[in-house]
Amino acid sequence: MKIMAIMGSPRKGSNVDILIDEVIKGVKSKTAVELDKIYIYESDIKYCTGCGAHSILQGAKDCPLGDDMDGILKRMQKADALIFGSPNHGRTITAGLTNFFARMMPMLKMQIERDEEGNIIHAETKPLIRGKKAVTVVSQVDFAASSSALLLMVLDANLRDFHLRKVGEVFSTGNLKRAQVKEKEADLNLAFETGARLAVIK
């Protein structure tokens, strides 16, 4: 099974990183895994400028930024499942993951219909990664789950935009220290079981 895990925390070995690894262990308990783990903050991923170069309205050109994202998107299309992880930063996902989703826009291929005069009368997008399975992983300092209400909405909305099939969610609260989740057997088990489910759901 080919898995791409997108680590949206700026800290390696963080609670999110640990939980993502537990999800992957769960997948490995059911099937062989070919893992492609992306550390956003260690990658050369420039900020999206919203130029729309990829849009058919502007010639469906390649992204002009020319960084690591080109290869990431090509590999993403070959993945069987995607894992997106982020800590709660200001009640939402990290700036790095926000930009990552923006840079995924070339995965949305627009199809348009014109009338006899050339006016656009209908347009729709068809994601190149539609139907792929996805899991989200979230950690926060606050003990109140409601603190991540916006974050979870943002993650789910992005998955819907790309027509991904969310098959699981790992959500850990009260992580006051770095790597504290290592002490939380229930959260580690949830991550492992989510990975096992990801492996077997068709």
Feature-to-residue mapping (PLM):
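Helix-loop-strand module that forms the ligand-binding subsite of alpha/beta enzymes
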Residues: 64-156
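Residues at the starts of beta-strands that form the adenosine-phosphate
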Residues: 2, 34-36, 133, 166-167
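Short histidine/acidic/glycine/proline-rich micro-motifs that form metal-
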Residues: 10-13, 88, 141-145, 176-178
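A short beta-strand-loop structural module common to alpha/beta enzyme folds
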Residues: 33-43, 169-173
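N-terminal beta-loop-helix "entrance" segment that forms/cooperates
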Residues: 39-61, 177-186
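N-terminal beta1-alpha1 ligand-phosphate binding loop
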Residues: 2-33, 143
